[in-house]
């Protein structure tokens, strides 16, 4: 009974399983990430939803730090390099594009267009409509192909695609203008006499044409052009890296990376290893010198000690000789003293004998003391 009552939940509350709770948390997290998703050509999300910069190839921790990364020095340098590469690639293309249109317009204007004005007015709407339809279909095909292939390309080339589309639009307008002039020539040819038609059947249309007909423009995704642009950008970057002086960038790591030189840390490690090797060599040489000096000092000390020992032995010999001399002198003095004592004893014994003799005599006798 107690277990059943404890298993019950209080009234008015809903029991949520752990799986459902996890699902709700994941959904909430997905909604929050979708809300904060950054819309930028350089922002890239992986399958885990982590933000990174495709231009710098650096991960960004959160969407709040994206603005600081965009304002950073490394990102701005990469954007400037990309803009410089775009200017370098657009320069020659812009200079060479208008040439064929100029040739066409000059060739068409040189012809007599006054004779075929009526026929031109009839043919012009149909040709302009067909050219417009062709341009629209080409643009749609290029847009579809670019949308398919753009998924595999880096986002830093999206701006290049837009600029290429603008250039194609400009070229389409020029082609429209030229197509307006071409029907003039066609109408004029239709209005000409039959002898000219016979000559055209015999001879080719333009036997002295120095300009060969150009291949029709086929809409494509622009991957070939982008590969060429990428190669030009890489070559330009290599040339700039070779031309840049040392210390061009404030950050030493970026400077070394651009100039294709070892990083300062690696350079310092190499210098530290070389310094340690040199110190080891110096230490070995100094140790050998110290060992030689120690050996010489040891020999000098041994020679000095031997000299001191010899001097000490000499002093000991002198002291021994002096001791022997003093001993001999003492012996002589002692022998002399003994002899003197013996003599004195003999003299004393003689005096005592005489005194005893005198005392033994009778002093009263006349002439006894004499």
From Swiss-Prot:
GO-annotated molecular function: nucleic acid binding; zinc ion binding
Coiled coil ranges: 16-40, 310-338
GO BP terms: blastocyst growth; cell division; chromosome organization; intestinal epithelial structure maintenance; mitotic cell cycle; mitotic DNA damage checkpoint signaling; mitotic DNA replication checkpoint signaling; mRNA processing
PTM section of the record: Phosphorylated in response to DNA damage by the cell cycle checkpoint kinases ATR/ATM.
InterPro entries: Matrin/U1-like-C_Znf_C2H2, ZNF830-like, Znf_C2H2_sf, Znf_C2H2_type
Segments of skewed composition (Polar residues): 90-99, 121-134, 196-212
The keyword Cell membrane appears for this protein: no
Region (Disordered): 1-21, 75-220
Compositionally biased spans, kind Basic and acidic residues: 104-115, 172-191
Modified residues (N-acetylalanine): 2
Gene Ontology annotations for the cellular component aspect, listed alphabetically: chromosome; nuclear speck; nucleus; spliceosomal complex
Subunit-structure text: Component of the XAB2 complex, a multimeric protein complex composed of XAB2, PRPF19, AQR, ZNF830, ISY1, and PPIE; this complex binds preferentially to RNA. Interacts with XAB2. Identified in a pentameric intron-binding (IB) complex composed of AQR, XAB2, ISY1, ZNF830 and PPIE that is incorporated into the spliceosome as a preassembled complex. The IB complex does not contain PRPF19.
Name of the molecule in the record: Zinc finger protein 830
Lineage, top ranks: Eukaryota, Metazoa, Chordata, Craniata, Vertebrata
